[in-house]
Swiss-Prot record:
It comes from Geobacter sulfurreducens (strain ATCC 51573 / DSM 12127 / PCA). This is Ribosomal RNA small subunit methyltransferase A. The keyword Methyltransferase applies. It catalyses: adenosine(1518)/adenosine(1519) in 16S rRNA + 4 S-adenosyl-L-methionine = N(6)-dimethyladenosine(1518)/N(6)-dimethyladenosine(1519) in 16S rRNA + 4 S-adenosyl-L-homocysteine + 4 H(+). One of its GO terms (biological process) is rRNA methylation. The gene is rsmA.
Length: 276
């Protein structure tokens, strides 16, 4: 991989995973059997792709870097089960694109650069019915937020929205020396297993997202200060009444609320006339 003359592009947040032990463990987490389908986001130079291609009945890899696409296509030219797509994962209609290559469920493997991790995560969240598992490598800071529980400093919007629909577990801590070039921070591999049903009933998911995002908009402010002002379609006095009916102290902060409490708050606000 280092002898191909292709340097990592800082603008794309590229750090190529070279540690074979970690690559093998990630492939084992993906755990695709014969006939199963894998979407790989950002295959880079194809290190993980090689492991995944040994498992999958169909592997679709989406790569943005136009320097790497010919390298990948050349490496896997003899494997009809591997398709390399040149493009930005954020520009693709996942449902339409994957539909060309087979029916769900798909498994996902990705090494997500920090600068695009959040938008890609939301794309995967919104297309969750296509997937049976996600194995994602992220900067440790982002990974910790996704797996965090109430009361921790990492707990936030990502924690709540993903844990509504997935079991999220931290699986592999990846040190900087496992990459080339060497990054300055640790990474973590997370496993996301979709739930058959949302963990709790939230009433209206679009409105639920609004409530959660508003609750974390000013982390040092109380829920009352975050939610008042009418942006959620409920007058200021109505917000106070809803919090009281839900048994949630208005002086608490968003990071202390459990998923169930966010669901109760959302349904209470909807009942009080809340709207998008």
């Amino acid at each position: 991989m280092r002898g191909d003359g292709i340097r990592a592009r800082k603008a794309l947040g590229q750090n190529f995973l070279t540690d074979r032990s970690v690559l093998s463990r990630i492939a084992a987490l993906v755990s695709a059997g014969a006939g199963e389908r894998i979407l790989e986001i950002g295959p880079g130079k194809g290190a993980l792709t090689s492991y995944l291609a040994e498992q999958a009945g169909q592997l679709v890899a989406v790569e943005l870097d136009d320097r790497l696409v010919p390298l990948l296509r050349g490496s896997f030219a003899g494997n009809p089960s591997v398709t390399i797509i040149e493009g930005d994962i954020l520009d693709l209609d996942l449902r339409e694109t994957l539909g060309r290559y087979g029916t769900p469920p798909w498994k996902v493997a990705a090494n997500l650069p920090y600068n695009i991790s959040t938008p890609v995560l939301f794309r995967l969240l919104d297309a969750r019915d296509l997937f049976s598992r996600l194995v994602l490598m992220l900067q440790k800071e982002v990974g910790n937020r996704l797996a965090a529980g109430p009361g921790s400093k990492e707990y936030g919007v990502l924690s709540v929205l993903f844990q509504l629909h997935f079991d999220v577990t931290r699986e592999i801590l990846v040190r900087p020396g496992s990459f080339h070039p060497v990054p300055k921070v640790d990474s973590v591999v997370l496993l996301f297993v979709p739930l058959a049903q949302p963990r709790v009933d939230v009433g209206d998911e679009d409105y639920f997202r609004r409530v959660v995002k508003a609750s974390f908009a000013m982390r040092r402010k109380t829920l009352w200060n975050c939610l008042k002002g009418g942006a959620l379609g409920v007058p200021t006095d109505g917000i106070r009444d809803v919090l009281a009916r839900c048994g949630i102290d208005e002086g608490r902060r968003g990071e202390t609320l459990s998923l169930q409490e966010f669901a109760s708050l959302t349904k209470g606000l909807l009942a009080a006339g809340g709207s998008l």
